[in-house]
């Protein structure tokens, strides 16, 4: 059974059709990179999958269960939408850390808020919070940021902030990680430290969808590559097929201008 199945996802903004019927599926532990020119619909697709945008048509299923169906016109409550979003961990090109909180608090804030819904919260609050903080500290250790737990975002480099953002997303134990151009706001020197973290997640069989302009990285880390153009999937296949034997003229043109 596929961990994620996306069927006929369509999205328009005004008169502009941004997504024109997107279909794909992925297996648990698989890494899919989505490539394409700016404006091809990559980010909008990612946002529709994770319910940051509401698709006009189509369905999204996780573990065989349809969690979004655009044909059902009743609006989802904020609580329902949040429950759907918990299947996914989000990492954006802008780090979106809370400037008023230190690194540890940025990572533990959402898990602690969710913990309040537990039936044993009042009785075991201290123990629950200790477990959450222990998880956060382990994530910081894996990210090479143990010494930054009490630092604030303004005291970190861009690469360090993005690594904290990744740790924050992982702290909620998502089924699937969604990365939207996670290195585009970074200097070249800082890009590698973030890509190294993402590669380490792939090595642990974390299921991931990565929108990226880092072609060499996509070639290295992906099980499957999707090339989007004009709101559709123009071509998809293994990294060897996409980068080594592109079939469409549009993909050939795109790759000729990309750094491989």
Where are these regions (language model features)?
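Helix-to-loop junction immediately C-terminal to a conserved catalytic motif
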Residues: 50
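A short, proline-enriched helix->beta-strand linker immediately N-terminal to the Walker B motif
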Residues: 171-175
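ABC ATPase "signature
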Residues: 236-237
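Conserved ABC ATPase signature
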Residues: 152-156, 160
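Helix N-cap at the start of a conserved alpha-helix in ABC-type nucleotide-binding domains
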Residues: 188-190
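Catalytic Walker B motif of ABC-type/P-loop ATPase nucleotide-binding domains
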Residues: 177-180
């Amino acid at each position: 059974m596929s961990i994620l199945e996306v069927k006929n996802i369509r999205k328009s903004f005004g008169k502009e059709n941004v997504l024109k019927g997107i279909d794909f599926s992925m297996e648990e532990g698989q890494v899919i990179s989505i490539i394409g020119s700016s404006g091809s619909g990559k980010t909008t697709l990612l946002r529709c999958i994770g319910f940051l945008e509401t698709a006009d048509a189509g369905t999204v299923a996780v573990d065989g269960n349809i969690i979004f169906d655009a044909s059902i016109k009743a609006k989802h409550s904020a609580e329902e939408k949040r429950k759907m979003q918990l299947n996914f961990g989000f990492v954006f090109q802008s780090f979106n850390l809370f400037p008023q909180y230190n690194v540890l608090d940025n990572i533990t804030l959402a898990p602690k808020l969710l913990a309040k819904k537990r039936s044993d919260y009042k009785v075991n609050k201290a123990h629950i919070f200790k477990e959450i903080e222990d998880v956060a500290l382990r994530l910081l250790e894996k990210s090479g940021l143990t010494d930054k737990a009490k630092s604030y975002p303004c005291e970190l480099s861009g690469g360090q902030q993005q690594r904290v953002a990744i740790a924050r997303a992982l702290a909620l134990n998502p089924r699937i990680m969604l990365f939207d151009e996670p290195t585009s706001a970074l200097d070249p020197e800082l890009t590698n430290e973030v890509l190294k973290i993402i590669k380490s997640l792939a090595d642990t069989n974390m299921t991931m969808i990565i929108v990226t302009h880092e072609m060499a990285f996509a070639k290295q880390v992906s099980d499957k590559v999707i090339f989007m153009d004009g709101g559709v999937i123009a071509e998809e296949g293994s990294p060897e097929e996409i980068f080594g034997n592109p079939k469409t003229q549009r993909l050939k043109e795109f790759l000729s201008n990309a750094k491989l």
